[in-house]
Amino acid sequence: MPVKVGAPGAITPPADLVIKTAKRNEEKGYDSLWYPDHWMSWHPESIWTEDITPIAKFQPNPHVYLDPVATMAAVGVVTERVQLGTCVTEPVRRHPAMLANEWLTLDHITKGRVILGLGSGEAENNEPYGIPFEKTVSRFEEAITIIKLLWANDEPVDFDGQFWTMRDAVNGMQPYTPGKPPPIWTGAHGPRMCRITGRLADGWLPSLLTVDEYKEKLGIIRESAAKAGRDLSDFEAGMWNYAIVGTDHEDTHRILEATLLKAYMLVLGAEAYQKRGMTHPFGDDFHGLSDYIPTRYGRDETLKAIDQIPFELIHELMPHGTPDELIAIARDYEAVGAQHIMLWNVTFLGDFTKVGESFHLMDDVLAGIKSAV
């Protein structure tokens, strides 16, 4: 199966630009566009200042996100070929029945081009808003079961679970293509999430994994599927990661040192640091996205933490280099099983003067990956 290439969808106002960007990316040849489901950014607003990023001049805080369901509906009307997916939503804020209905709605609007990217959720998008955030992996597994149950039946159904109980619940809407509901991809990283993916999901979209880590976790998924008697011939293994692109490799090292880029490493759990002989700035008991709530970190505390992040960590986890080097990195992931690759250009967060150049260079990356198929 030829490798597919995805791109991030624009997710901040103005809406007209979101639509224009989607149409342009489809015309360029991207196979998919991906939209996060966030209320809160991974960057604390305490470091979202003009001395750190010029973006703060026209976007006063980092927590600006359009709703992905509404956005994909709008984009789906003006595009014809490109797939649209979330990277990722979750069943903590969104009830499984709501997800089932929303994605069937998108399925009809896009004429069968939508993907339900689903994860177990992040503390930042739930706990501050008064939404209980516990047993999220079990909730994630149960939600997939409910969604598939509702998609498979147009008659009333009952369900007795740990988190949800349904009596005489019905979803009468059928998929755009009869018998072919939207695929469910997971943002799985831990062993249990990967095993659930192998048993229940149709695709996989992890992030911030090295090639070796990717290979290991995909192996867990395949083993779990085999034990469940599942055929993975239609399963699609994706990968998305932040990327830095430039005309000079050493200059991308300079950009990697930028405050906002190193801040992405704060979302990792302590285990990711410990396995590399490093210590997480927030301590050995820090559980990454299960603990991280950026609005609760002041400027001094955040900058101190970022200063403690080893360069070797971001160098290893964030693809960077020239277009040819990024193409080679994509090929490395493809060699261990990746079938759908999305590189999220964040070069401009490290050097805003590179915004135009970096997106032009990403076009070269797209062309290179496609031409090597």
Language-model features and meaning:
Residues 1-78, 181-182:
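N-terminal beta1-alpha1-beta2 module of alpha/beta enzyme domains
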Residues 4-16, 88-97, 178-189, 243-246, ...:
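Active-site mouth loops of central-metabolism enzymes
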Residues 14-25, 99-102, 188-196, 256, ...:
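Short, acidic/polar
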Residues 29, 37, 75, 106, ...:
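Conserved, mostly hydrophobic/aromatic
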Residues 136-175, 212-335:
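An alpha-helical appendage that flanks or caps ligand/catalytic pockets
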